[in-house]
């Protein structure tokens, strides 16, 4: 029913997502239609996602990880989403093979739990090519990709608690990523001194942009 979208614009509120409460009680962060759609379009573009992709989600959709970094991508790509109530290390790869999953999401130590499962002849018998998430330890990153044949692992940094999200889209292990689409954004990373808790500045007082 098109009338349900009457008056909806890019800055309209899509939903409220609560922060983790790192600096106090959880706070409601407003997610706009434009931000949600923009994230999906961005991921769709640089990952080459399309209607043939199948997305595997075991994380809660009320959390920014699944909502922003998986569901928006699937909608933008026109793909299908396979939902599980919870993560299961023993069932993960069976689901991936059974449903032809091509994109999956992880959080925290999920990849370590998968890596700690006994090796099987079917470890590479799947269509999964991309895993997105945060928290994959550099100590197992390369071994995890090699064992399961995952072509690309993308870590994201910055959910509801940061103004600029960064992504490691280069398969560079341990990198905190970079600002995506730099040529289309006015966001820049500048040098900061953690010891003095202050920005590092040029003699004229301007901020110093970080280099490669």
Task: Go through the PLM ranges and name each one.
Residues 76, 93, 98-107, 115-199, ...:
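Gly/Ser/Thr-rich phosphate-binding loop
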Residues 14-38:
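Conserved AMP-binding A3 loop
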Residues 37-54, 62-102, 117:
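Conserved AMP-binding/adenylation subdomain of ANL enzymes
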Residues 204-212:
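AMP-binding/adenylate-forming core of the ANL superfamily
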